[in-house]
Amino acid sequence: MTHALLIGNPNCGKTTLFNALTNANQRVGNWPGVTVEKKTGEFLLGEHLIEITDLPGVYSLVANAEGISQDEQIAAQSVIDLEYDCIINVIDACHLERHLYLTSQLFELGKPVVVALNMMDIAEHRGISIDTEKLESLLGCSVIPIQAHKNIGIPALQQSLLHCSQKIKPLKLSLSVAAQQILNDLENQLISKGYKNSFAYYFSRRLAEGDTLIGEKAFTESLLIKLQETEQNLDVLLADARYQKIHEIVTLVQKKHSDASEHFTAKLDKLVLHRFLALPIFFAMMYLMFLFAINIGGAFQDFFDISTETIFVQGSGWLLQQLHAPNWVIALVANGVGKGINTTITFIPVIAAMFFFLSLLETSGYMARAAFVVDKAMRAMGLPGKSFVPMIVGFGCNVPAIMAARTLDSERDRLLTVMMSPFMSCSARLAIYAVFVAAFFPSGGHNVVFSLYLIGILMAVFTGYILRKTTLKGHASPLILELPAYHRPSLRRLLRETSLRLRFFVYRAGKLIIPICVILGGLNAITWGGGISSGEANTDSLLSIIGQWITPLFAPMGIHQDNWPATVGLLTGMLAKEVVVGTLNSLYAQVGHVGEITAAHFDFWGGIKAAFGSIPANLSELGSALWNPVSASAADSELSQSVYGIMSRRFDGAVGAYAYLLFVLLYIPCVSTMAVIRQEANKRFMWTSIVWSFVVAYATSVVFYQGAKFLDHPQQSMVWILAMSLSLLFVLAVFRYSQYGMGRQNAAANT
């Protein structure tokens, strides 16, 4: 077996290459002692097994105790500590000179290295030609030109790993005699301490460049003190010598012609990064994403809903009736498992549309600019602009967004990002929005969704601002970001990335929604006295009693006593937000007897025909929905007979529904999010997030509902608005003074 490390600069296509090499044969875990994700994969080449470990993206192997993220520290330590046979160094052919800096450091390890020269097609498009044979000769290692996103050059790279045994010699750097003597002395001292010759050479260079995390602490500190006494700026001298050597190599192997794409990028950036137009363009892009997801994705939603309802709910119920199964079995299978499958599959088109648009923004190069644009606004409030990059990931799922905060250098910025990320509307929340938009906002539903996403962003910023003024005081670290050139992503790549994200989401949602629907169906079938009902909802069921008991707590935000399924949805949503849709769909169906199946009413082919017929019908209304959302009407004539119809009767109109959506947006994160907050921060931060999000959600929903209904009952509304305002101020005061101890404890834990 051959074990190879995959390393390269950020945004060099390393992850794309890792996926191309290993396909689905991947494992994800954590590096020992830290929470940084560790990805390994393998593939067979004939009968030879090759294992790949994907290291975090880094610009340099120098690991300093201050100003380095966990990702960078892991990469720097892994090249020393792990047992491996060779290194695959991924280089962006468009930025050869900058990427060879890391290559020069890797050569000093004395290990076999294969250079994967990626994005050759993009380089050619930009007028860059590279003589790979001459580059291979000058570096002294294999150089394989590849296009990872098109799987071009991958077989040649795989073959090179079979013959990767030649140890690489370091590049010869032009240093002064005095500087070279100091490095030789360092190397000899390390050898006398028991280090192998190759590691002694490598460590001496890292120490000279200011690395404080390698070797024995006491010994390396003494060497660093001696270095400071030499009055030689070895780190600067080494960096200058590296760039000088790299420039010589690049001059010999690279030719650059006129680059039309650079001119196009520069012209477009004048508009996209304009001082006054940048933020409006950013919000316009976000708005287009929700417009695309709700209208384009929503056009196919009825197809998935009707077809899966016909097959898994009505079909399974009809089949069990033919087998004379008991009513409780029919209820559990049809309205439990069947309704769970129906719920999971129904919101696939909306989620897929959003993932597709996100992938388009990311691969085109705009998303990096979005972080740059938002940085100025966030830094004005003392918040780190870098936080917005992980927070954008939160539009898909809050869990990876919080985990992505590991890439931030500052501990303060990392904790701020962890606490702000749960307010970003994840794709599971989008599924809930889509259901309510169909029931209550058939015209201009994308405007409703956009407002919710915007409120989530504003609440995240507000939370960060409060933390900056209390627990996490300090200055925001500067944003250093590489802005890639704009390019047109291939449809194949967009579909592949959308498919990968969608499969993960559906798998995660399905394995939660289906069991929850079965459990809810069981609780709804069991009466308080221990009997079994026929499967229809009744006021004596355990679920009904629990829901009715808790519902009065939510009365100020418009949830009335007969709308107890909405309360149960909030409770199950604490497990996972995608479960809310399954809960509402299951309970409202049983309350309204929508799930009752009879042999006389079941028409399989009629249901399938109606499902296919919904696609052209919805697409024909797409133009009016996009260009004239006010006059467009998507009201369904059969809405009153469906779950949507039951929902519209139970909620207090559009106002009550929007108040409910505000609570869903802001309240307690799901179990997975809470767990990762505890993992990335500590228990106190987790509980702070839970309490803060619940208070903010409740206060915001109540204030909105009471404000909207102010004319109906002005005195009652005024009391509730004042009460919520005072409660929020009280929590802020408690938060300010009680968090001081938490901040000190956390600071101590991280020193």
UniProtKB/Swiss-Prot annotation:
Domain of life: Bacteria
Transmembrane portions of the chain: 276-296, 341-361, 385-405, 422-442, 447-467, 512-532, 539-559, 657-677, 685-705, 715-735
Binding site for GTP 2: G33, V34, T35, V36, E37
One GO CC term, this protein: plasma membrane
Lipid bilayer topology: Multi-pass membrane protein
Keyword annotations: Cell inner membrane, Cell membrane, GTP-binding, Ion transport, Iron, Iron transport, Membrane, Nucleotide-binding, Transmembrane, Transmembrane helix, Transport
Protein name as catalogued: Fe(2+) transporter FeoB
Chain's gene name: feoB
